């Protein structure tokens, strides 16, 4: 187990080039299932150097795994080092989220790649897609009030039953919208959520 900041990417690899629409940063501590984590795009706490490392590492893993199409990778940033914690040569639950918030139709792009097109010949380019000028927060939704025998402690097993999305010009506004979308009561002053 590594403490640190968890990061996640979805990408498309065509055998030569990769397109990563965006890097998502998890808000909670590492070790929480990614489906149960609050996630923010664009990431708040990583350097351009770390973004380049994630881009190159994801590209290299896709090449070594023989991926043509979608890839999902999860990382931890700990003591200024990037560590791979999981890589999946497939789609993930974050594909609709990152597609919506970046405007990159990832499934369509991956399908075109699988059918033989090259990323460099498409309108979205290669590498890390330019970041948006707004923030998007993916918020898990839980049903603990209906599933009363479920342990509510967060860990590596997913417990959420849905997700919602908050989008705004600032991170605090996007986070507030996401909390409201998940029907969480947010105090106007002080308190805890």
Q: Across the structure, where does each feature detected by a protein language model lie?
A:
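ATP-dependent carboxylate activation and anion-phosphoryl transfer catalytic cores
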Residues: 1-191
């Amino acid at each position: 187990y590594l403490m640190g900041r968890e990061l996640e990417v979805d990408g498309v690899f065509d055998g030569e080039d990769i397109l990563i629409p965006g890097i998502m940063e998890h808000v909670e501590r590492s070790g929480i299932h990614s489906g149960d984590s609050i996630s923010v795009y664009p990431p708040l706490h990583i350097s351009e150097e770390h973004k380049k490392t994630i881009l190159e590492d994801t590209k290299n893993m896709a090449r070594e795994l023989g991926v043509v199409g979608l890839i999902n990778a999860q990382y931890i940033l700990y003591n200024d080092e990037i560590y791979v914690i999981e890589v999946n040569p497939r789609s993930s639950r974050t594909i609709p989220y990152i597609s919506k918030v970046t405007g990159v139709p990832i499934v369509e792009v991956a399908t075109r790649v699988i059918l033989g097109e090259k990323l460099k010949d498409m309108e979205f380019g290669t590498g890390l897609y330019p970041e948006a000028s707004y923030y998007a927060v993916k918020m898990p939704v839980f049903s603990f009030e209906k599933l009363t025998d479920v342990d509510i402690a967060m860990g590596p097993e997913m417990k959420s039953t849905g997700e919602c999305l908050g989008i705004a010009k600032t991170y605090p506004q996007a986070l507030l919208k996401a909390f409201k979308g998940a029907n969480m009561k947010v105090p106007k002053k002080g308190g805890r959520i």
